[in-house]
A protein has these predicted regions:
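Generic surface-pattern signal
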Residues: 5-9, 22, 82, 113-116
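Well-ordered alpha/beta subsegment
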Residues: 84-116
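Charge-rich, low-complexity N-terminal segments
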Residues: 1-19
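Long, contiguous binding/interaction regions
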Residues: 19, 52-53, 106
Length: 116
């Protein structure tokens, strides 16, 4: 988990995401780059990334981005963008493992389902 090295929060959140998906989507794979950890099935559906790596003064240490075929309406999202006709990206700032509550776990599983 070299990408999350040095981030206690990042390591804990990645472990929680793995735990959540292990039971419902055991076929999930990970691709780690210098900038992110991407979770995939047939397609990518979630990305954990550290904004401070690029925006030194960023307020959030960690962001979970979820790809869905539709827009979710929630004030919890920092930003929602529509980069492609069939994809909505939902950016959630994560300040604690507790932020991955039942609502977020539901969104994560929905994104994994949609990625096929």
């Amino acid at each position: 988990d070299r990408f999350m090295a040095g981030s206690v929060l990042g390591t804990a959140v990645l472990a929680r995401v793995r735990e959540v998906l292990a039971s419902s989507h055991p076929d999930v794979t990970e691709r780690t780059t210098v900038s992110q950890v991407a979770l995939r099935r047939r397609r990518g559906f979630a990305i954990l990334w550290r904004p401070r790596q690029y925006l030194g003064d960023a307020a959030s240490e960690l962001v979970l981005s979820l790809a869905l075929p539709h827009r979710l309406e929630s004030p919890r999202f920092k930003e929602v963008v529509h980069p492609a006709r069939t994809t909505w990206m939902h950016h959630l700032e994560v300040a604690s493992v507790d932020d991955l509550d039942a609502e977020v776990v539901g969104w994560l599983r929905e994104a994994a389902d949609a990625a096929g």
